[in-house]
Amino acid sequence: MKQLHTFAVCAYKESPYLEECIRSLLFQTVSSNIIIATSTPNDYISSIAEKYDLPLIVNPGESGITQDWNFAYTHTDSKYVTIAHQDDIYDAEYLETALKKLEGARRPLIFFSDYYEIRENEKTYSNRLLRIKRLMLLPIRLPMAEQSRWIRRRILSFGSPICCPSVTFAKANLPYAVFQHGFRACEDWQAWEMISKLKGDFLYSPRALMGHRIHEGSETSAIIEDHGRTEEEYIMYRKFWPDKIARMLNRAYSTAQGSNHLE
C-alpha cells in the first residue's frame, strides 16, 4: 500500500543537529515514513540511521543541493513528501496541519507554513526578515487566493517568502523532479516559480510550525559569503520583470542576505 507521506531527511557530512531534526519528525502527532538520503555517506550518518531504524539511501551520482534534493524527492513512494533539512526542526503539529490542508484541497501542489529561526539554540519568532516575508504572504490568505496563479506569481515576483524546509509536495500533481540543476542559492525560488504556473493550490498555514536554523556552517551562509546568490536572484527577477526593474529589485533584495549571519 502506498504511504501517505514521507519525510526525506537530506543529511550532509556530520551535522550535530541531524539527530534533533529526526527526533522532531518522530514526535509528530501523526505518523509518517522517514528516510535519510545522503551523497556523503559516513559512519556518523549510518549510526543515526541504525539508532532510529531508518532507511538510509545513498546518492551514487553527482552531489550538490539540487541533485541531492531531487534524489531524495524522487526516491520516495508516497503521495506527499517533505524534504527535511538536517539542521532544522519541526513542531509536533506540522504534519497534521499539512495533511489536513492537502487532503482537503481539490488539486494541491504544495503546502507550506510560517516558520521561526533558531539562532544559537534560541527561537526567534520575529525579526525584520520574518516580518517582511509574512507581509509578502498576506495576499495568499485572502478567500480563494490559494488557487490563484496570478496572486502567487505576484508574490514571487518580489522575492521568495516561502521557507523551503516548510514545504510539503503533492507529488502526483508535480513534475518528476522539481529543482533545476545549476541553481545553488535560489533553487527553492526557482522551484516555486515553476510550480506557480501549474493549475492547483498553494496551501499556506500562517502558524510557525517549524524552525529554520541559522548558523555560520550552513550552506546558505557559505553562498552569501562568496556572493553567489546575487546573480541567481537577478535571473529569478528576470522571469517576472524587464531588465531595469529586475536590477533595481535585486539591489534591494540583496540587503536581506545579512539576515543569515548570527551577528
Segments from the language model and where they lie:
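Short, acidic, metal-binding catalytic loop of nucleotide-sugar glycosyltransferases
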Residues: 23-32
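Cell-envelope/extracellular polymer assembly enzymes that use nucleotide-activated donors
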Residues: 4-6, 33, 190
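Conserved donor NDP-sugar-binding/catalytic core segment of glycosyltransferases
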Residues: 93-133
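N-proximal low-complexity "stem/linker" segments adjacent to membrane-targeting elements
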Residues: 1-24
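Short aromatic/hydrophobic "clamp" motif used to bind/position activated sugar donors
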Residues: 81
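Glycine-rich, basic loop-to-helix element that forms the pyrophosphate-binding segment
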Residues: 60-76
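Conserved nucleotide-sugar donor-binding catalytic segment
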Residues: 138-229
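A conserved acidic beta->alpha catalytic loop
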Residues: 37-46, 61
